[in-house]
Every structure is written in structure tokens, then in C-alpha cells.
């Protein structure tokens, strides 16, 4: 894999197709912007030659976004000669090193990597072994497989997983429900303001496989009082948004509130 280092006009850079990692606002982006302002872009982005003199970003989408917002015209880049599948693997591996990743990001990243490595003639076992080594010793092949299951969730349910309203393991169970039943479940979750526990999700899956899952069944399951249910204090984002910078995410606001309460 040959590579060269050069400065590239930022207008010639295009995002990676179907990039599974979402744009990040908030504290992390602000810190990156401050670093670029003081020191310039210290770490080159990684790209590959594309069409008509353009370059596809493999690693460094957030850095490019910050540089654009700051009016920087050129960025240092490592230009690598890569196939599409090689580019997918590098893109996924470099982004999996981020400190904070949403379950949906991991899910679609693993799926993309699995498909790319299959194109290279590698087995599933080789794929998950490499993925595990690139993340941590705790990320087993079985866990990677669970993450990929999340790609079968409809967007409404996957959003609840990212927001930590539905826990990871129950979400895996719900991913086996057909799309029409998932849509009904999402509506009932909104109506009851309750999400299924692991045991409830397992029952919903079982009822579905038996052809016994209905709106009434879903409502009855979600309406059950959970043994470990605790009283919660909830705020509407719109009610507290005015007290925080516009760039703050919901997680940033939560961390700030907890920090202030600890000092109270």
C-alpha cells in the first residue's frame, strides 16, 4: 500500500460514502477547534485519490469540518493507494478509536467492515478477531455479532438505544421482530413512556415467533411494573436548552448538571 504526504485544498475533499459515524457537536469539537486554532492541524488526515482530481476522506472527517468552519484552505493529508474495501476497513478501524461511540455507529461500522473483509475472501472468524484486537480484549466476536444485529432495528428503536432508553441486550432481542411489529412497538413505547427490560424483550420476541404478538400484548407487557423500577426525574430538553451553549449535546448538558449538583 503506497502513500504520499501532501497539502490538499479543502474543496477537493469529499466525505466517505455511507460514513456510519455521526457528526459531533459539543465539548470534544470545541477542544479540537481550540487545538487547531493554537497549533494548526497536527495530525494529517488520511485520503485516497477519487475522481476528477478529488480525494475521498478515509479518516479525519471531523478535522476537515473544523478546518472548513475556521476558513482554513489546505490541510495536510496522507494519500494512500487503496481499494474500496481496504478504504472501508481503514475508515472503520480509525474511527473505532474514538472515545465516545453510539451503539448505532458501532453496529453499522462492524457491518461495513464485515462485508468489506468478506469481499477479500476472509471468514467471519477472521473479521471479528481483527475487530476485537483493534478495540479491546473485552470485545468478543459474539459481541461484534450482537452489534451487527442492531442494524435490523428500525430507526425509531435504534434512536432509543443510542439515547440509552433501551438497553443494549434487550435491543438485540427486539432486532428479531419483523419491521411491522417494531413499528407498533415504537408507537406503544411512546404511548406508555416505558421501554422493555431484557425479560420483557425476550417474551416479545417469543410471542412474535409464535405469531401471538399483537398491539394488546405489547401494551400489556410494557405496562408491567418492573421490579427494579425507580422513580425518575425528567426534564424536557427545550426547558433547559436556554441555559447551555448552542453547541452542547444532551450528554454535555447531563454531565454539567450532575457536576453542579455534586458541588451543591
Give residue spans per PLM region.
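Short, charged/polar connector segments at secondary-structure boundaries
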Residues: 1-80, 86-99
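Compositionally biased, intrinsically disordered low-complexity segments
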Residues: 8-11, 39, 48, 115, ...
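Amphipathic, charge-rich alpha-helical segments that serve as recognition/docking helices
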Residues: 21-23, 29, 65-152, 159-162, ...
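Glutamine-centric residue-chemistry signal
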Residues: 41-43, 97, 120, 126, ...
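Short runs of predominantly hydrophobic/aromatic residues within well-ordered alpha helices
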Residues: 63, 85, 106-107, 167-171, ...
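Amphipathic alpha-helical extensions and coiled-coil-like segments
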Residues: 112-114, 141-255
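Low-complexity, acidic/Ser/Thr- and charged residue-rich accessory regions of DNA metabolism proteins
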Residues: 254-264
Amino acid at each position: 500500500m503506497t502513500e504520499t504526504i501532501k497539502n490538499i485544498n479543502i474543496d477537493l475533499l469529499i466525505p466517505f460514502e455511507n460514513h456510519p459515524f455521526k457528526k459531533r457537536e459539543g465539548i470534544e469539537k470545541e477542544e479540537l477547534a481550540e487545538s487547531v486554532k493554537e497549533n494548526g492541524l497536527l495530525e494529517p488526515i488520511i485520503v485516497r485519490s477519487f475522481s476528477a482530481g478529488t480525494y475521498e476522506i478515509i479518516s479525519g472527517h471531523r478535522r476537515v469540518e473544523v478546518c472548513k468552519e475556521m476558513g482554513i484552505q489546505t490541510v495536510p493529508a496522507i494519500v494512500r493507494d487503496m481499494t474500496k474495501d481496504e478504504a472501508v476497513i481503514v475508515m472503520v478501524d480509525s474511527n473505532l478509536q474514538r472515545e465516545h461511540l453510539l451503539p448505532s455507529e458501532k453496529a453499522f461500522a462492524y457491518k461495513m467492515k464485515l462485508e468489506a473483509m468478506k469481499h477479500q475472501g476472509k471468514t467471519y472468524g477472521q473479521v471479528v478477531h481483527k475487530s476485537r484486537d483493534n478495540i479491546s480484549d473485552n470485545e468478543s466476536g459474539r459481541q461484534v455479532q450482537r452489534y451487527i444485529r442492531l442494524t435490523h432495528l428500525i430507526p425509531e428503536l435504534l434512536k432509543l438505544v443510542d439515547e440509552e432508553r433501551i438497553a443494549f441486550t434487550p435491543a438485540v432481542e427486539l432486532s428479531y421482530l419483523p419491521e411491522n411489529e417494531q413499528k407498533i412497538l415504537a408507537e406503544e413505547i411512546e404511548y406508555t413512556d416505558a421501554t422493555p427490560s431484557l425479560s420483557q424483550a425476550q417474551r416479545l420476541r417469543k410471542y412474535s415467533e409464535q405469531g401471538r404478538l399483537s398491539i394488546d400484548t405489547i401494551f400489556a407487557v410494557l405496562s408491567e411494573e418492573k421490579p427494579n423500577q425507580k422513580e425518575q426525574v425528567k426534564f424536557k430538553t427545550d426547558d433547559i436548552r436556554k441555559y447551555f451553549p448552542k453547541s452542547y449535546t444532551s450528554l454535555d448538558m447531563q454531565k454539567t448538571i450532575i457536576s453542579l449538583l455534586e458541588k451543591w
